Regions:
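Short aromatic-enriched loop/helix-cap "lid" or pocket-rim segments at secondary-structure transitions
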Residues: 17-18, 42-44, 147, 181-185
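Glycine-rich, phosphate-binding/catalytic loops in enzymes
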Residues: 20-23, 63-67, 100-101, 153, ...
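Pocket-forming structural segment of enzyme catalytic cores
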Residues: 96-180
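C-terminal helical/coil "lid" or tail adjacent to the Rossmann-like core of SAM-dependent
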Residues: 166, 175-209
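Cysteine-nucleophile active-site neighborhood
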Residues: 50-119
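N-terminal beta1-alpha1 cap of cysteine-dependent amidohydrolase-like domains
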Residues: 1-80, 197-241
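Hydrophobic/aromatic beta-strand patches that form the interior of the parallel beta-sheet core
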Residues: 4, 29-31, 48, 83, ...
Length: 241
């Protein structure tokens, strides 16, 4: 299996998903849209789309965004399974016919996430506890197209969705993140406008991270494994059809 890993920024990479991808795939192709021309959509059996500080409506400020969206449209047309995280989830929602919108208040830190009833049979999120704490850092929220399944929510926004008729999932929470990444984000972005608006207690976030990251990484690894295993099962089914 050949997996496309779309990384928007050096400090927003695949995290704990990286080892899973290399474990499950024969080849992992990392694409950094701001630096490289897009690869051909054909030839990938799965795609992972990660986060970034930019937003889905900033095509003018990030000239590579339209090309990425076109590549994602091609992947959707081919039926290629995709899992988007944070910005990645918002991009998948927009490309599929929905969008993303700015939130009244950014969501940063550890928050309670609750699965919906529709998540019970979902191959990715179904094995998770009905309620869990997940790590967040976002000021936009995904608005998936009509017909998409809402799989999880927090008090602030939709946290996970899947498309009907296509093997695409979006998760707003950062299931891929490591403790080192969180510390780096706090050091680099704590003075940003959105972080200031959120009025975050950074010492508390770091303390919670130390307490919760091991379990969180286990859950993130599980989500990525189940996604790639599902993608592999679709390949087997296609070969047997």
């Amino acid at each position: 299996m050949r997996v496309l890993s779309i990384v928007h920024e050096h400090d927003a990479g695949p995290g704990v998903f990286a080892d899973v991808a290399h474990e499950r795939a024969e080849e992992v192709v990392e694409w950094i849209p701001a630096r490289q021309a897009p690869p051909a959509a054909e030839g990938f059996e799965a795609a992972l789309v990660f986060g970034g500080a930019m937003h889905v409506d900033q095509d003018d400020g990030h000239g590579w965004l339209p090309a990425e969206k076109q590549l994602l449209r091609s992947l959707l047309g081919l039926g290629t399974p995709a899992l988007g995280v944070c910005l990645g989830a918002q991009l998948l929602a927009e490309v599929a016919g929905g969008g993303a919108r700015r939130m009244t208040r950014p969501e940063i830190g550890w928050t309670l996430v609750e699965l919906t009833g529709e998540a019970a049979t979902d191959p990715l999120l179904g094995p998770l506890p009905a309620r869990f704490e997940g790590f967040q850092w976002h000021s936009y929220e995904a608005s998936p197209p009509d017909g998409a399944l809402s799989l999880a929510r927090s008090d602030a926004c939709l946290q996970a969705f899947s498309l009907t008729g296509a093997p695409w999932w979006g998760i707003q929470f950062h299931a891929e993140v490591t403790s080192e990444t969180i510390a780096g984000w706090i050091a680099g972005y704590r003075s940003d406008e959105d972080a200031v608006r959120a009025n975050v207690n950074w010492d508390a976030v770091l303390l919670e991270t130390n307490q919760k990251i091991a379990r969180w990484n286990t859950r993130g690894i599980g989500i990525c494994r189940r996604f790639l295993d599902h993608a592999a099962s679709l390949l087997v089914a296609e070969a047997q059809a």
